Amino acid sequence: MAKRQASTNIIAGDFKGTKINFKPNKSLRPTESKTKETLFNWLLNDLDQKTCLDMFAGTGALGLEAISRGAKKVIFVERQKRLCRNLEEVLKKLKIENKCKIINTNAISFDFSILKEKFDLIFLDPPFRENLSQRSFDMINEYDLLVEDGFVYLECERDLDIQKLKTSFVKIKASEGGESKYYLFKG
């Protein structure tokens, strides 16, 4: 019996068209291509030499898209070991291990201070219905993870009341699609 596979694609840049295969599970929601296109248009595709943090990496789709579009470095944080192994295979296949680091841990309990690094762009696409959006913003502030004028992308469940999020970041873009809403904040 063949193993079921699912995939998502890198949609632009050096690795445009590359498939990222993964074993599907109900907690995994790779960011849709249309959503990625909107996000990177919001950023004006200006990722050249930027450092990125993909806090709930999953398949790594957002961080890989950033590398494909010129980001200098991406750190992926993912709690599921199987997804980390899958992401390692993708990095090797694309020969970009030197631009990426994978940390297999729960992003919410990780001590980000050991990275001694700030990021130009932080991707937040936490599991839905676990109340992780506010905690994620709190961690960004607590560990001072964002450079001045950096960006935070948040993808969340459609019914999350974004007005209740406490953050010093300014919401500059918003859209929605399917079961998700997504936002771009500026630091």
Regions found by a protein language model. Give the residues of each.
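Class I S-adenosyl-L-methionine-dependent methyltransferase catalytic core
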Residues: 1-187
